[in-house]
Amino acid sequence: MLRALGWLVLAVNKVAMRGLFRLRVEGLESLTAGGPLLVAPNHASYLDALAVAAALPWRSLRHTWWAGWTGIMFAGGGRRLLSRATQVFPVDPDRDPAGGLALALAALTRRYVLVWFPEGRRSPDGEIRPFMPGVGTLIQRSGAKAVPTLIRGSFEALPRDRRFPRFSRITVTFGTPHTAAELEGMGAGGSASARIANGLRLAVLALGDNA
């Protein structure tokens, strides 16, 4: 019953995002890589998770888990039910960062797809903020490949200071998957986790340069 509710929610979301926001999806071939995958989008709007969910093919959604901030996704019984139905697990970077990382690592160890927003919070101005080193730790410990993912248009549609969205186009671009070693070689920082996180951010930014 719970899983059926999740599929219904995801189906309605796909129709809404494609109809209202004219969702465009690029780079789906990046999701065919073997092994566990960590999908790492930039985060500028509440619409971001909805856009990624609508962009992912059904074959991927079956095995996809999501990191959801407890202050939003687990605030109240209805939201908790919705989160369980759509395979969202709680993350609280302020009170229990280790707990969220442990749940994420468990999902990747089981070779699932994991959607993780490395900035931690929505950007106040639409610019891509520094990525937190936790994502580097996840990639390093799990052996998962990271898929840099760029969301364009969500900030213009629903920035932090706006209550109701503008129905403008949103584009989701999935980039080439990278290993921890590749990302560490691309990035800068005082630790391996920081270098991996920075390399991943640069890979997301590069998707905008190539648009």
PLM features: what roles do these ranges have?
Residues A4-L8, A98-A211:
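Non-catalytic C-terminal accessory region of glycerolipid acyltransferases
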Residues K14-L20, P90-D94, D125-G126:
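Short, flexible loop segments at the rims of nucleotide/cofactor-binding pockets, characterized by
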Residues A16-R18, R59, L82-S83, A107, ...:
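A generic structural signal for well-ordered alpha-helical segments
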Residues E29, T70, D92-R95, L150, ...:
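Residues at the C-termini of beta-strands that transition into short coil/loop
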